[in-house]
Design a protein with these regions (language model features):
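Extracellular repetitive beta-rich solenoid segments
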Residues: 2-31
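Phosphate-end processing signature that detects enzymes handling 5′-triphosphorylated RNA
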Residues: 32-298
């Protein structure tokens, strides 16, 4: 009789019951969709939350508790002039965080606009995960199998799989990243097999710097407040400041209700943050990816 019994662990990995040649029962791992993490992101109006010197206004900071500087990040993206990688759902990022020791290279595969309405549904998530599963992004994928994340914005959600590599250890307290030549050499030598697009002609888009603050919302979850000042448009000398307020589900420290799914909890917390920002007049009612802005303007 053919064995079709599949066991699933708490982290979403799946195992099939098998019997070896000696009649001993065991398990064999089989491909399964990754269990996604969630990051909720909203944009706020810089002129309403910042003082003239660039510091955050007290009334905005008072929406949260434990508002504190977390660090700075310098980053560049690598793509062709016509952004052929991004158009195919791929991004390559080089970055260094001031509170981390190592420079990092990230290869990311994105599945954009997975939701049909502004509130993400489980059916949207499951459909996107199964599309990715058919393309080899599963729990057995050597580079990308450790997890995936859903970026959940004002009206759009994107499923992404990341493959992170350390480039060099330069210590904390700096945001030094390799130059274009060194970055391209590392990217070319370490590109995952899943990325089958040609890398000839890629160049640096950036570099830009990000300043991050952390705070606590509703006494249950850490939020990040990140600001980035970049070109307002390609070849423009004018600058634009983008400020994003976000949280990751993994930073939730409140009560876990049995039977409540990750997405149900995310939607509840998202509503709290939305009401906080919208109710105080800070929310920008639009989506916006920092990645896209840097790629298109540099």
């Amino acid at each position: 009789m053919k064995n079709n019994i599949i066991l699933e662990s708490n982290n979403g990995r799946r195992f099939k019951l098998v019997v070896d040649d000696n009649g001993i029962l065991g398990t064999k791992e089989v491909p399964a969709p990754c269990r996604p993490g969630y990051e909720v992101k909203f944009l706020v109006a810089p002129d309403l939350v910042l003082n003239s010197d660039g510091s955050y206004k007290e009334e905005f900071k008072n929406l949260f508790t434990n508002f504190a500087l977390k660090g700075t990040t310098r980053m560049s993206y690598y793509d062709t002039e016509d952004l052929s990688l991004n158009k195919a759902g791929w991004t390559i990022r080089i970055r260094k965080k001031s509170n981390k020791k190592a420079q990092q290279c990230t290869f990311k595969k994105r599945y954009p606009n997975i939701n049909k309405t502004s509130v993400l549904k489980q059916s949207n998530v499951d459909k996107a995960l199964n599309v990715a599963l058919k393309e080899g992004f599963d729990t057995l994928n050597t580079g990308f199998g450790n997890g995936c994340e859903i970026d959940y914005g004002y009206s759009k959600a994107t499923l992404s799989y990341s493959y992170d590599l350390d480039i060099a250890t330069t210590g904390k307290g700096n945001v030094d990243i390799p130059n274009q030549e060194g970055s391209i050499a590392f990217i070319t030598a370490n590109a995952p097999s899943d990325l089958t697009l040609p890398l000839e002609g890629i160049r640096e888009h950036g570099a830009v710097e990000l300043t991050s603050y952390s705070a606590i919302m509703d006494n249950v979850i850490e939020v990040a407040i990140e600001s980035m000042t970049i070109k307002a448009a390609k070849n423009s000398e004018e600058l634009e400041t983008i400020i994003e307020v976000s949280f990751k589900l993994e930073d939730y420290a409140g009560e876990i209700i049995e039977g409540k799914s990750d997405l149900q909890l995310v939607n509840e917390l998202r509503e709290v943050l939305y009401n906080l920002l919208h109710g105080n007049g800070y929310l920008l009612e639009k989506d916006g990816l920092k990645t896209t802005a840097v790629l298109e303007r540099y």
